[in-house]
Every structure is written in structure tokens, then in C-alpha cells.
Amino acid sequence: MKKLVTLTLILSSFLVFSQTTKEFVDNVVNEVESNSKLEQLAHELFDVIGPRLVGTPQMKQAHDWAIKKYESWGIEAYNHEWGKWRGWERGVTHVDLIEPRLRTLVGRQLAWSPSTGKKGLQAEVTKIPLVENKDQFSEWLETVKGKFVLVSQKEITGRTDSQWEEYATEESFEKMKKTRDELTDQWYNSLRNTGYGYRDINSAIEDAGAVGLISSRWSKAFGANKVFSAGTEKIPNVDLNLEDYTMLYRLVENNQKPVIKVIATSKEHGDVPTFNTIGMIKGVEKPEEYVMLSAHFDSWDGGQGTTDNGTGSIVMLEAMRILKKLYPNPKRTIMVGHWGSEEQGLNGSRAFVEDYPEIVDNIQALFNQDNGTGRVVDLSGSGFLHSYDY
């Protein structure tokens, strides 16, 4: 039901000559309320297939699944191959604190992380120090050989600001924010002093002989980290939950010389083809003019691939299903694009524009969703002249 407004707005944009607009909207609402397939689509895509990182078997599985869905509804669909990507498959991640005590830590490898192998790696942990210049950082780099390196800032709290505001005194809340801001400024100033950018500092540590990197990019929400790409070529990069990461950080700060064991397996599959999934309902009066539904199909793979952008993907699937059922002979051709590799630079949709100029030149309207969960609170227009008028 959260997607009812979105579906109605999309579907009511199509002029149906045999019905009034109100009749058509009523039929759409009735179909969504009494025969919605959204929950089943969500289960199959999010729970069974899971996240869809470009280049993984799960991404290809999702493309093929979408085609079968469209074909089962009588909708023409195909995979548009637009290029190659690094083939990679996530395996098991297991992290244990060995010294100064035993504890299993909560973590997962970052996307495209090199594998530790089944036996794993065991080593002491160190951290990036605060430095005043590149020479200090270069001197520290000489100490990292054979160690895991903590490469993220230590957070001073794992509670959200809304919880602090609700339960803390005003004085303690303001003190926490001030301390957090000071530590954050200190951290980023030190990173700049190293002479390396955010993207290449990992490579410098790898080249210095570290056995692995330990990251933690907290999203400012309970239990949720941002898990993106490893940024290494030969050594693993593993994300730890905030509480485990900050515990390790404190152990290093207090010279406890913590030791961890990391098993993070993954498979490399070489270069693999990458796709967009395209579906269409042919127009009967102006088939060479197009109305386009759009949502990127890929995701990062640290979560389920649901919010970004599985929700938009199943909305477009459901919209096409309902259109085929209630409006099987549209005036113009209705197309849907499930784009691959949006997260790496809008690659799939850019490739479609390049490969199909005759379609792009004749698009009359395009509806895209990449909003995540929750109710629709804003409709923005862009790209087409006078689009905001609609």
C-alpha cells in the first residue's frame, strides 16, 4: 500500500479512450488493493535473489527473473547487453577477536574485496594515526607490514541524534555534538595532511604491506553501515559494525595490541557481460513514440538491495503488469528500463541512450523512481521542456 500513490500517478498518466480517467484510476486502485503482486515480487527479488551488485551472479539472476515475470504477464522483454564488468561473488565472512580476549565480531567484506582464502588471516591490528604532514604518515606506513589497519574514524556514540535529543540533558547533548565535530575535523584534517585522497589512501596502505583493512562507515542509524567497494587489489577490506570497530580502536589506542582472525572468502569470475532489462507494450496508434518507466536494478550488496533501488524496481514491474491487464493496447509504446550499474556511474542508462537514439529521441514522457521506502512526498520534473507543468 505504500506504493499505491506512485502506481496510481504513473498509471493514470495514460489516456484510455474506452474509459473516463476516473474509471481508469478506480480500476487501478481496485487492482492494487485487491490483487497487488508487490509483496510477492519483493519477496522473490529481495529475499530469494537478494542484493544485485553489478558483475555478480545475483545481478544476472535478477535480470533473468524479471524477463520471466514479464513473459508470464504477456509482456515482451529482453536483456540489453551493454558492456563488461568485473565478475565477483561474495562468500562467507567471519571475524574473531583473538587477543586480548575471545569474541566473535560482526562484519562483512566490502564489494569486490580480495579473498583471504579458506584458512583466513590472523594478525595484530593497528590504526591510521593523526599526522601533521606527509613525512609523518610515510614514517608510519613503514610499521604496517603484516598487520590489519583500521582505516575509518572512531565514532564517539552509536546512538542517533534523535535519541540523544529525547533522553539526554541539553548540556550533555551539546557537549557530545561539540566533541564529535572537533574529532571529525581533526580526523579529516589529518587525512589531508597524509597527502593522499580518500580513494587512494587504501592503496598506499596496501602497498606498504598491510595484510588487510578494517572499515566502518556508520550511517548514523542503529546497526546500519554503508558498505561500498573495497578499494584494494590484493588484500581484503572488511566492514565491522560500529560497536565492534570502536572496541578494536580503543584497544589499539590503549596499546593492548589486539589480534584478530579474518576469514573473508570471495570468487573472481573474470570479465562478465552486463545488462539492462527492457520490457515493452507495443503502441497501436503511434508505436514509434514512447512513454518510459525507469528504475535502476542494481544495488550495493552490503544489505538486501531493497531501499536502493529494489522498491523502485518492483513498482515499475507492478505498473507494467497492471498496464498490460487494464490497458493492453496503448496509443504509444510503453517501455520499462531496469538499468544495470547505476551505482557505479549511471552506466546502464547511459549505454541505453547511446545504443538506442531512435527511441530516446521519441520519448514523450519518462517516469523514474529511486526514492526508497515510505510514502511519496514529492514529484520533481526535469529533462523535458515544460515537464514541471505536468
Question: Which role fits each region the language model picked out?
Answer:
Residues 1-21:
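Bacterial Sec-dependent N-terminal signal peptides
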Residues 41-44, 79, 127, 148-152, ...:
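Structural recognition of the beta-strand scaffold that forms the well-ordered cores
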Residues 40, 321-347:
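Short helix-loop-beta-strand segments that form the rim/entrance of peptidase-like active sites
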Residues 22-24, 114-138, 222, 227-306, ...:
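Soluble metallo-hydrolase cores and metallopeptidase-like ectodomains found primarily
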Residues 102-104, 118, 123, 142, ...:
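Metal-dependent peptidase/peptidase-like ectodomains
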Residues 183-195, 199-202, 206-207, 212, ...:
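Active-site-adjacent substrate-binding region
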Residues 22-56, 82, 92, 220-229, ...:
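N-terminal capping segment at the start of a domain
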Residues 43, 47-181:
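Noncatalytic luminal/extracellular "stalk/propeptide" segments of secretory-pathway proteins
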